[in-house]
Amino acid sequence: MKKFILIIFIFVIFIFGIFYMLFFTKIGNSTISKYIENSFNEKQNDFKLKFDTFIIDTNNINLVANINDSSKVKIDGKINSLFDLKAEFIYKIDIKDLSIFNNIVQKELKGSLAANGDLITKNGLSTIIGTSNIANSSTKYEINLNKTDIKSLDLDIKNANMDELLALLSEPIYSFGKLNLNAKLIKNSSNFFNGDFLFDINDGKINNEIVQKEFNFPIKQTITYNLKSLNKLENTNVLSDIKLISSLANLDMKNLIIDLVTKDISSNYFLDILNLRQIEEFINIALNGDLKVVGNINKNQKTLKIDGNSNIAGGVANFVLLDDNLDLKLKDANSLKLLYILNKDQFFNSNLSLDSNYNIVSKIGNINIEVKNGNFIKNNFIQKIEDFTKIDLSKEIFEYGAINSKIDNKKIYSNLNLTSKKSDIKSKDSFIDFNKNIIDTKLDINLNKNIFSVKLEDDLNKPKIIVDVQDLIKNILEKKLDKYINKEDDAQKIELLKGIKSLF
């Protein structure tokens, strides 16, 4: 029995001696360093690893590694206990070219990275504390790990350059600006992160050149912005409050909820466009005035729904966009104000309501407009009619009117009906082509039994106006002839006048 115990004791001493010689002697350190170097250098060709210093003993660690002769990683620390793996280290990282790690992280990286701090370990639990100048920022961080699993993260980034961050991640530089980010995240028992992360972008500016290159969409104006986002992470949900202030528009999104698993999104929003003329290059329509919209956004794996309401042209507008279909309703607006917003001639004053359905993909839809108590405004068109007919159309009040239109890819086919107590204006199959900017319509006008027609042709902005007064002249002559016939006693003259009347 004593021999057996002695053999075991000698064996343990031998194993410990081998272990000590392998890990804590100069020969052992040299062997391990060469093994690590060869392992890294043989498995990849992106960079070469070489240790300038590799010292490990029972109390201290001192490592200096060169990466491609231009970058260095230094680790210097004290081993307090081998049995519970308790140690404290100071590290310094200076990477001149992050692209050497592209294959390892499966992501294109650019730029440089400098970081330094402390690493404390015990029983597989580690805390990494440090600072960095990533993207020319002032960054502080604290990461707690259980072996290699992140348990908590405390990150504070101040004044990082947006363009440098995007370049570091090898993303197109869509924007310039200063990024601030503060995150405090803790992993829960369900292996999800909970906590708050706040970020803002100050002095943001869109990079027009990159936007044109990436999206083939030229932007002429300078777009500046500031963005602030307050976020809470609860398991798989992100709860956010976002405020965007820009030279184009302001946007508030409160109670934004994003499910990171299903990608579902829900939020309310408030959109404030201060000057509609500034968005002309994005919508290809010159508009006047401003626009404020309040609504909701809901998206799931099957559908996208956006609704909103606004006060437009003195009326109330409501819309619902469900996937590709847009339903728009406008009630009790003023037509003059609406024409001003649409940057069109203010030729008709009335109370106006409309109901429209439009598919934004097929570009097919319909629009029905109802007007009440309307009258034409004196303009060149009305004056030309008056010159031909001696009738002032602007004095007529049309109590009711309807315009029913079909939309087919910027082509509109319409029927018009305006009625007053004694008059009416009708048009059938009127045609407007916004692509070619042309109009082709005929208005049949009956003003207190004075009948004539007006054709509008060619250029939509300055159409050719053709007034057909044949029916009007006929009606006037018939009235005159009837007057003479009723006064005439001579039968032969009466027959002559009737013969003349029959010519019309």
Annotate each PLM feature.
Residues E209-V211, I377-K384:
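Outer-membrane beta-barrel and related beta-rich outer-membrane complex signature
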Residues D69, I95, I134-N136, N159-N161, ...:
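Transmembrane beta-strands of outer-membrane beta-barrel pores
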Residues G17-I90, K96-N102, L119-T121, V454:
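Terminal hydrophobic membrane-targeting helix
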Residues D46-K48, N66-D76, N103-D118, N133-E142, ...:
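Amphipathic hydrophobic-ligand
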Residues L85-A87, S126, K151, N191-G195, ...:
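Outer-envelope beta-barrel architecture signal
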Residues N66, D94-L98, K110, T121-G124, ...:
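Flexible, solvent-exposed coil segments and beta strand-coil junctions
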Residues M1-I13, G17, N41, T53, ...:
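Extended terminal
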